[in-house]
Amino acid sequence: MRVKDTLNLGKTKFPMRGNLPKREAEWEKNWEDQKFYERRLKLNEGHERFDLHDGPPFANGNIHMGHALNKITKDIIVRSKNMEGYYAPYVPGWDTHGLPIEQQLTKQGVDRKTMDRAAYRELCRKFAMEQVEKQRTDFKRLGVMGDWDHPYITLLPEFEAAEIRVFGKMYENGYIYQGKKPVYWSWSSESTLAEAEVEYHDVESPSIYISFPVKDGKGKLSEENTYFLIWTTTPWTIPSNQGIAVNPKFDYSVVEVGDRRYVVGTDRLSAVAEILGWDSYKTVQHLKGTDMEYMVAKHPYIEGRDSLLMEAVYVTDDDGTGLVHTASGFGEDDYNTAMRYGFDVLSPMDNKGCFTEEIPDPDLVGKFYTDTNEIVKDKLSAAGNLLHYSTFVHSAAHDWRTKKPVVYRATTQWFASISKFRDQILDQIEKTTFYPAWGKTRLYNMIKDRGDWVISRQRAWGVPLPIFYAEDGTAIVTHETIEHVADLFAKEGSNAWFTHPVEELLPEGFTSEHSPNGKFTKETDILDVWFDSGSSWSGVQALGRAVHYPTSMYLEGSDQYRGWFNSSLITSVATNGVAPYKSVLSQGFTLDGQGRKMSKSLGNTIAPNDVIKQMGAEIIRLWVASVDASGDVGVSMDILRQVSEGYRKIRNTFRYMLANTADFDPEKDRVAYKDLCKIDQYLEVKLNDLVAESIVNYDKYDFADVYKLVFKFITNDLSAFYLDFAKDVLYIEGKDSHARRSMQTVIYDAAVKLAKILAPILPHTMGEVWGYLKEKEEDVYLSNFPEIEDYADADDLKESWGEFMKLRDDVLKALEEARDQKLIGKSFEASVTVYPGEAAKAALDKLAGEDFREILIVSNLVMGQGEVPAEAKQFDQASVLVRRAEGEVCPRCRMYRTDLGADSRLPQLCGRCASIVAGDHPEILEEGLED
């Protein structure tokens, strides 16, 4: 037998390389075949629930890194909650109605205006379900576990029926009304938009200053050559002007410039004078805003049109002139002010953004609104009322789907009245927990400031508004009509609205005093898609999915404070008086490595599927766990490669632990904690602390700290310390020796506990690790998080070993200096004498019996007594003297020993190794030992 054959070298088939792109798919198939998701829930039946309600992604296109961040975070939470013992189901969902799907059909050459509506909607449904199937495959490939065979989908009949009932309950409670008021209007999609469907981009717009001649100053202001001065960025709205708003709290100045007088806000006067080039002007009069109410101006270029002066507190002195042009059909503030003063709404624009015959200037009829800016400018100039024209860049509202500008346009729509139950909503926000905490303020302020919700849309693909109209135009919505429509939708889906005549959509024998002839018509608009997803708390129940209400958590991107978090809260409070969630967790956006938004034009997008093919889903999952996603997070291939290095470190550490516990049977070889060597007890205590802190961080949804703690433990406590000196015990000591079994106990425990703690983050790899451990559960996901032990001596151990670690640092510094001086090469070439300080000596006394030489990986260690030699190095905890070790290298333990050949039967070995080999391999005493 050769010397190396006497060593207890670790062996394992656990591969060094994960080959993740190939093997992950195999593991995922096994999870599905073995029904691990269902079995985990079965284990937790009857336990406290944790329900994470999935915010439905839109079923259109390939998944992106934002999807990956979101879905993996949810999966980490659900897995960790299940491993804590909660009953934590996960039911994925999809949002399947809306304009993007219509746009995709248009790209395929489908013209909805030439088709039967029901047939067109069937094409939309088919396309949406194809997208669901594609995304379902991609999400599962990220390692996300859930009830993928029974998702909730907003186009499913039962879901649509539930949504109709939510609408009906809101109507019954008095929260739904029809009105004509300005809403965001997308001419590019020919539909209204909710606030959540609007995004902002920089555009270049006109900036013009216009004078309105005073017609009636009510005896307080001269009409002769006197003008009200306004500023606007929308010249196209000037023909529809109905009034001028002033702030009742502001002071105004009448200034003389040449032969004209202008009324300007006093605090804006100097800025306006500079812009208009008034080198000299004279203030001739002061007015209060209240003085000007009900004064009348002439339209700046349309004969016979007047403009009323009205009070409005929203007028600011941040920009402009302190007087604001008001057109009731093209602005929410304009509308509200005009209504207070008894105006009719003037909104002379069609669905495509072109002016209708209602416009007071007939030259503009049929023209696209922005094309009229130049015409209006020229007419103002000809009338002598254009004082200044320039352009400037500012942020303007755009349709989030088409990326085209939107306008405020007054149209007849259906609304949810937020004002009627705003206080209830705000009260529910106060009772909700937010991660991060600032989310509470953000959502609170959005609800506090938001106007009524326009819920009708002029599109084809969506859930129809379940409203009928009588012969006299009266809208009809009753409990009976809602239930009848909902029951029909539950059987046939919402396409029934378009395939059945109105008589079949109404309850049998339905009558109304408003239809003496029994004739009715049905609404053609559909519900806002945010009403779809905002009703998901109800739809998922109607589908019989395993999600309780109110649910434990909603988790989405921070844009959903104005989207899904918002709409879900409104529908739930409006119908049941409670928030649909107990907690809300929001995430930032995924940016590239330089902090830029990802876009195809910049070429900085990363597709999760491409990463999976190159590196594996585990690398994406580890990236998700490593970042603080409460804000925006960067991702690039370079960043993912760095994450991959971290993964490799984790994998190799597990491989070492598995190899060196391959001959360890925890049932018969385990050493009880009280009998462990003190250094092993210390590592058990450190491991226990790691488990406790990790579970706390899982409960705080702080996965970055879980990863940091685990990686630090693996890198510092295991690789750089414990496993570094472990070879001297694991390889050299007797196979069944107490020291070796003690250390194997700790290493095995570390492998088991770390696998459990990392399982929610790296389920593929930890499942692979689990297959090499001797645990009873079939998969790590079927086990629970480790129990937290109560070690009575934990504090004493940490204090004593903490002092030793400081001493160790001093010894390592001394060894490094000896290396620099060429005194030694490897640390085992050294003989070290330590003269400990008081704190270190006290710690060493408490740890008496430990082999510190072994821990320091030196050939000889002496605790010096008496006077410290002059050549010793002085450090914080001790003085250290390093000499080259005497003796010869033992070929087995690689230490310098002076007792080689002490056992004549094994002359090559030192006394320690000879004794061990004789005990483990007595046959060698007969056969002899080769080098």
Curated annotation (Swiss-Prot):
A motif ('HIGH' region) lies at residues 57-67. InterPro entries: aa-tRNA-synth_I_CS (IPR001412), aa-tRNA-synth_Ia (IPR002300), Anticodon_Ile_BEm (IPR033708), Ile-tRNA-ligase (IPR002301), Ile-tRNA-ligase_type1 (IPR023585), Ile-tRNA_ligase (IPR050081), M/V/L/I-tRNA-synth_anticd-bd (IPR013155), Rossmann-like_a/b/a_fold (IPR014729). A motif ('KMSKS' region) lies at residues 597-601. Its EC number is 6.1.1.5. Zn(2+) binds at C890, C893, C910, C913. L-isoleucyl-5'-AMP binds at E556. It is found in: Cytoplasm. Its cofactor is Zn(2+). Keywords: Aminoacyl-tRNA synthetase, ATP-binding, Cytoplasm, Ligase, Metal-binding, Nucleotide-binding, Protein biosynthesis, Zinc. Binds 1 zinc ion per subunit. Catalyzes the attachment of isoleucine to tRNA(Ile). As IleRS can inadvertently accommodate and process structurally similar amino acids such as valine, to avoid such errors it has two additional distinct tRNA(Ile)-dependent editing activities. One activity is designated as 'pretransfer' editing and involves the hydrolysis of activated Val-AMP. The other activity is designated 'posttransfer' editing and involves deacylation of mischarged Val-tRNA(Ile). Belongs to the class-I aminoacyl-tRNA synthetase family. IleS type 1 subfamily. It is an enzyme of class 6 (ligase). IleRS has two distinct active sites: one for aminoacylation and one for editing. The misactivated valine is translocated from the active site to the editing site, which sterically excludes the correctly activated isoleucine. The single editing site contains two valyl binding pockets, one specific for each substrate (Val-AMP or Val-tRNA(Ile)). GO terms for molecular function: aminoacyl-tRNA deacylase activity; ATP binding; isoleucine-tRNA ligase activity; tRNA binding; zinc ion binding. This is Isoleucine--tRNA ligase. Monomer. GO terms for biological process: isoleucyl-tRNA aminoacylation. HAMAP family: Ile_tRNA_synth_type1. Transmembrane segments: none annotated.
